[in-house]
Amino acid sequence: MEAKAIARHVRVTPRKARRMVDLIRGKKATEAITILKFAPQDASLPVRKVLESAIANARVKADKAGEPFRENDLVVKETYVDEGVTLKRFRARAQGRAARINKRTSHITVVVANKEGNR
């Protein structure tokens, strides 16, 4: 059984979020949460929240289907980060000029599945 969670318009750059996502791809869900909990990068928090949401979605799906739910059997099957909208801001510079600042956003997707379904 698979469960998916998506966070859209997260204010973290896609490049930095992809670094976190690459750490957890293919790992057990509980191990991935531990990795993200102790990662010093700021992007680890939104990725961890999406992962926890995917685990909760798997729990709800298992309850609806009447299947037993074991969190230890979940594996991060698929995870990726897409680029969201870019907020464009300007910073005043010398001699009346302005420099553009891009505030990038990300769409983070995490799919968890049982070990049996992953093979």
UniProtKB/Swiss-Prot annotation:
Its BP terms in the Gene Ontology are: translation
UniProt entry keywords in alphabetical sequence: Ribonucleoprotein, Ribosomal protein, RNA-binding, rRNA-binding
Mind telling me which InterPro entries this protein's record contains? Ribosomal_uL22, Ribosomal_uL22_bac/chlpt-type, Ribosomal_uL22_bac/org-type, Ribosomal_uL22_CS, Ribosomal_uL22_sf
Membrane-spanning parts: none
GO MF term set: rRNA binding; structural constituent of ribosome
* Top-rank taxon: Bacteria
RNA-binding: present as a keyword of the record? yes
What the entry lists under HAMAP family is as follows: Ribosomal_uL22_B
Q: Does the keyword Lipoprotein apply?
A: no
Oligomeric and partner information = Part of the 50S ribosomal subunit.
Q: Which residues form a coiled coil?
A: none
Mind telling me which NCBIfam families this protein's record contains?
A: rplV_bact
Q: Which organism is it from?
A: Bifidobacterium adolescentis (strain ATCC 15703 / DSM 20083 / NCTC 11814 / E194a)
Q: What does this protein do?
A: This protein binds specifically to 23S rRNA; its binding is stimulated by other ribosomal proteins, e.g. L4, L17, and L20. It is important during the early stages of 50S assembly. It makes multiple contacts with different domains of the 23S rRNA in the assembled 50S subunit and ribosome.
- Recorded protein name is Large ribosomal subunit protein uL22
Similarity comment text for this entry: Belongs to the universal ribosomal protein uL22 family.
Q: Give GO cellular component annotations, separated by semicolons.
A: cytosolic large ribosomal subunit
